[in-house]
């Protein structure tokens, strides 16, 4: 529905696309009329224990357990998130459950682009010889819309990538892939726990 985190997550949990309810940017509150019928409250009403771990970013002024039907078992942090979910899966359950694991990564590529510290720990950079190549559509064409350069100039302070060299972009792509690998390994811990607890038939 949108590439922005807050509006995209709000769409998932309310069932409404961002343009339907005016959620055009991060930090925009969900309308009051939508807060009482969300994915969490619907599952809760159906008899499920609703558990949330990790990044929320749906409604800035609230956490998932205050209005949206969830019990929170881990804060907004990728560190320890998988372990918290595994710990929950290893418990005895008398009711069906709905567990959401809200990983932040590979979002940390945004912090890298802004020359900020990565919030959930640094990742090892690969040698330049192992950086991926650039896509065929990387080169700027003379017929590209002027609005692309204009948009880049507006966002330069937040994402100072306008002056990136081809090698800078190759390193960026390499680090993005490493972040994907990192979160993939964390999700693997949760999937392994589902295997170990033989939960697939009831999950």
Language model features with spans:
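Catalytic-site neighborhoods of secreted/periplasmic enzymes
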Residues: 10-124
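Short, surface-exposed acidic-centric catalytic microdomains
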Residues: 3-10
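Active-site-proximal cap/lid insertion segments
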Residues: 91-95, 103-203
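Low-complexity, flexible helical/coil segments
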Residues: 4, 31-37, 48, 133-142
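Short alpha-helical segments used as structural interaction elements across diverse proteins
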Residues: 6, 52, 170-173
């Amino acid at each position: 529905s949108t590439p922005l985190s807050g509006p995209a997550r709000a769409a998932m949990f309310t069932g409404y696309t961002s343009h339907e309810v005016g959620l055009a940017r991060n930090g925009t509150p969900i309308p009051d009329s939508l807060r009482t019928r969300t994915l969490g409250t619907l599952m809760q009403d159906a008899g499920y224990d609703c558990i949330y771990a990790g990044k929320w970013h749906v409604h800035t002024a609230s956490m998932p357990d205050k209005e949206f039907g969830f019990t929170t078992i881990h804060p907004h942090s990728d560190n320890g998130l998988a372990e918290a979910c595994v710990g929950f899966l290893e418990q005895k359950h008398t009711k069906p459950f709905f567990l959401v694991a809200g990983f932040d990564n590979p979002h940390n590529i945004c912090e890298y682009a802004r020359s900020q510290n990565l919030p959930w720990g640094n990742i090892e950079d690969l040698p330049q010889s192992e950086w991926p190549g650039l896509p065929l559509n990387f080169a700027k064409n003379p017929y590209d819309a002027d609005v692309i350069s204009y948009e880049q100039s507006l966002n330069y302070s937040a994402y100072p990538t306008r002056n990136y060299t081809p090698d800078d972009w190759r390193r960026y792509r390499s680090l993005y892939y490493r972040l994907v690998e990192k979160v993939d390994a964390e999700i693997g811990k949760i999937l392994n726990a589902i295997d170990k607890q033989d939960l697939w038939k009831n999950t």
